[in-house]
Amino acid sequence: MLHKINRLQFIFFAFFSALSANSLAQAIVNIEDLRREGEVGFFTNISASLDAARGNRDRDYYSLQIRFDNNSENAESFLILQQSERKSNNKTMDESTFMHGRYILLGEEGIHWEIFTQYSENPFRNYQKRSVFGAGARYELTNTMRLGAGFLGEDETDLSGKSKTTDRFGFYLHNDFEIAENISFNPTFYFQPSIDDFENDYKASMILAIDFKVNENFKICLL
């Protein structure tokens, strides 16, 4: 019976993995994997990575992340700052800047309220810069499933330098499926349609992740 259940879960994962190629056309940062939900205390984390290679082609890459979390029984909050850059023969090939701050007021009966702000720069990919400010409600549908609904204001500058301000609805659905012992499948779906042009102006993303939990302090995540 257990083998049959695991097989069905694998088929479910493979099916949605096949769909994800088209769904990631407008990538949205997955905040669900960044939460410390239910962990009480103050946490600080600083991580850095540096990679350099010399030869026919010189390659350099660095990334830096600073994170602060402050969680209590009544509220949770976190701030994340990220910066990365990749160069080849002293020419910048990719760079990104990301900042996200969020405050969650924990309510009763599985209904919580949150407010957030986000800023990102990604001039070599989808846009030059994007800033977002929003608020909404977060619902605990089950022990593992979360549903979010709210509003956000978006100010985005595309690769051509054209700026646009848009008010959007924001929806997301997240769940955790246990595939096997210490292995979980974590799909997250985002949908952000324009309030003024619901049918033609929207951003959607389906982010699929598999977590391999090695121990209480270390896990590997595959996207």
Give the role of each language-model region.
Residues I46-L50, L64-N70, G101-L105, A135-Y139, ...:
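Residues on the lipid-exposed face of transmembrane beta-strands in outer-membrane beta-barrel proteins
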